[in-house]
Regions:
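Short beta-strand segments enriched in small/hydrophobic residues
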Residues: 46-57
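Bacterial Sec-dependent N-terminal signal peptides
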Residues: 1-18
Length: 304
């Protein structure tokens, strides 16, 4: 209760402004460990996760904090073994087989193709661009096949931009990134308070400072089961000409793809958000979902 009160008031103070970077030290790790769940919600066999944290585009300062938070969730609960990497060879088909699920941790791409694999491969100037692009497409295909055959995929915040111009990836995930207004306090609400994956939260959701993401491409198809959202009318500084004054934009969702499970969680740009134990529980439950440990309603809303 004490942490929840402190968290609430810190959010109010920081309203409509960016939060300062947090030092990733032992004190911060200890704080998160004390707040993290001590057991898994859905008892299951221990699973292996890859948390992939390479960025070629925007460098979210929260990347190392997010990776550490994921590792703490695995250790505290005993539900997961977590391997961290920035090596794109992890997306070779033989290497993906080592993991029950993959987490894309703010894996922002950049440049003309908005393709993380291409961005990294083109650094090797001894290989021509056509060969590099062929390899990039191969790694993307490996990821799609991995999920189709039963692997899990959890994409966090800026990870939505990993392959931002790829319609195949957009359909797999359920969206591509369009833009975000300034950081601000956001009231995140529950789409269905009875869904098993949102039981960590109170009925009215939670408030935190974050970038409110808006989406494009496959998002318009709404081929996913939404979990969290914000009201568009509450978001300040929207892009001129694209202002949304009605309806909602989803913040987290799930979808089945073949035998695999996919989840997107937008929170958060800021490590301060992880000081909310409810959000840590949501992350842990989401990891269990993509690992195949949770039976729940995945029915997509689909826009007709």
């Amino acid at each position: 209760i004490f942490y929840a009160i402190v968290f609430f008031f810190s959010i109010q103070i920081a309203f409509s402004q960016s939060l300062p970077e947090v030092t990733l030290d032992q004190a911060w790790k200890d704080k998160i460990r004390a707040l993290a769940p001590e057991k898994a919600t859905f008892p299951a066999k221990k699973k292996n996760f890859l948390v992939f944290s390479l960025h070629t585009g925007f460098n979210h300062w929260v990347i190392p904090h997010t990776e550490e938070m994921i590792k703490i969730l695995g250790e505290n609960s005993g539900a997961f073994t977590v391997t961290g990497s920035k090596d794109i060879t992890e997306f070779e088909a033989k290497n993906l087989k080592k993991y029950d699920a993959v987490i894309l941790n703010n894996t922002c791409s950049i440049g003309d193709h908005r393709n993380l694999f291409w961005d990294k491969l083109k650094e090797n100037t001894s290989v021509d661009s056509a060969t590099s692009m062929k390899k990039a497409l191969e790694l993307e295909a490996n990821l799609l096949s991995y999920v189709e055959k039963g692997g899990g995929l959890l994409v966090l915040h800026g990870g939505v931009t990993t392959l931002n111009n790829s319609w195949d990836f957009s359909r797999l995930l359920g969206a591509s990134f369009d833009y975000h207004p300034k950081q601000q306090a956001i009231q995140v609400r529950l789409e269905d308070a009875n869904h098993p994956l949102v039981q960590a939260f109170p009925a009215d959701g939670f408030n935190h400072v974050d970038e409110p993401y808006f989406y494009k491409n496959a998002y318009a198809e709404l081929d996913f089961k939404p979990l969290l959202y914000f009201n568009n009318s509450e978001i300040e500084s929207q892009r001129k000409g694209q202002e949304l004054t009605e309806g909602k934009t989803y913040v987290a969702w799930i979808r089945a793809e073949g035998r695999g499970k996919v989840m997107y969680i937008s929170p958060s740009h800021n490590a301060q958000s992880f000081e909310n134990p409810d959000l840590l529980q949501f992350y842990l439950d989401g990891m269990q979902y993509v690992a195949g440990d949770v039976e729940c309603d995945e029915t997509p809303i689909k826009k007709n």
